Regions:
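Hydrophobic mid-bilayer segments of alpha-helices in multi-pass membrane transport proteins
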Residues: 87, 112-114, 143, 179-187, ...
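Early transmembrane hairpin of solute transport permeases
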Residues: 28-175
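Structural signal for membrane-spanning alpha-helices in multi-pass inner-membrane proteins
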Residues: 73-74, 119, 123, 189, ...
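Histidine-centered active-site/metal-ligand motif
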Residues: 283
């Protein structure tokens, strides 16, 4: 009787179907999903903190945004999906807007905030769906590849595997502990993914972190505690600078962010559409 009541509650709250699902399977799937995407906590923090944003605040914000958006998907849409900050738009924000164009991160955050509001509007009025349906399948895959290559290029540059060159634009960098460790991580991640190891990226990050300690790449902060209270959001919370909002340059930036965000979302839809069927059926 208790089991029936539990299944009924889970069915109402999360769309749990006791005929095709078990609590054990769903729990393991949830843990596996966490292990697979937990690298975003470290990567997003590293990318955004390179702009001068407080690292602790960014880490806390990333964790909270991921948890809240995933819970909303579970309870409101009843979809077994996890959501986290995009690994494309954060790189564009940090390396193009802030480091490339020289905008303070507060100004770039204001542009991103306005873009987010516009993105909600075009989603509400089904503009995004119209755009998605009008794009040929081949172009959808090309968008996915293009954004993926952009992220990969930034990763290779940050690791020192490639460096700038006046003649060829980029060339291979020197062998350093950082670049060797990065190459090891890439090969290890690829191997574990091919072997279909659950949590492949998580284990790759963990192993490379441990290898990096004797190499001097990984440093353990003084007074490090494995469990601690979350860092405050205050250094970055609502730190928007709207002083340059009503300028032509900012309008172009907001449009570019909107364009980038839309196609980054399309990239995600294409990937999910190939792996699951609930997105193809009305909900």
């Amino acid at each position: 009787m208790i089991k029936d009541y539990r299944n009924t509650m889970l069915q109402k709250l999360l769309g749990f179907n006791p005929k095709t699902m078990t609590l054990r399977t769903e729990s393991i799937a949830g843990i596996t999903t966490f292990l697979t995407m937990s690298y975003i906590l470290a990567v997003n923090t590293s990318i955004l903190s390179s702009t001068g944003m407080d690292k602790g605040a960014v880490f806390t914000a990333t964790a909270l945004a991921t948890a809240l958006s995933t819970l909303l998907l579970a309870f409101m849409a009843k979809l077994p999906l996890a959501q986290a900050p995009s690994m494309g738009i954060n790189a564009f924000f940090a390396f193009t807007l802030v480091q490339g164009m020289g905008y303070p991160w507060q100004v770039a955050m204001a542009a991103l905030f306005v873009e987010g509001l516009l993105f909600i509007l075009i989603t509400f009025f089904n503009v995004r769906e119209i755009v998605l349906n009008s794009i040929p399948a081949t172009l959808r895959y090309a968008i996915s590849v293009g954004i993926g290559m952009f992220i990969a290029f930034i990763g290779l540059k940050n690791a020192g595997i490639i460096v700038s060159d006046p003649a060829t634009f980029v060339t291979f960098g020197p062998f350093t502990p950082v670049s060797v460790l990065a190459l090891t991580g890439i090969l290890l991640s690829g191997l574990l993914v091919v072997k279909q190891v659950k949590g492949a990226l998580f284990y790759s990050i963990l192993i490379c972190t441990l290898i990096g300690i004797p190499l001097g790449v990984t440093t353990i902060p003084e007074g490090f505690l494995p469990i601690s209270t979350p860092h405050s959001l205050a250094p970055t919370f609502y730190q928007f600078d709207f002083s340059q909002l009503f300028t032509l340059d900012m309008a172009v930036i907001i449009f570019t962010l909107l364009f980038f965000d839309m196609f980054d979302t399309i990239r995600t839809f294409v990937a999910l559409d190939r792996e699951s069927t609930p997105l193809n059926s009305p909900h």
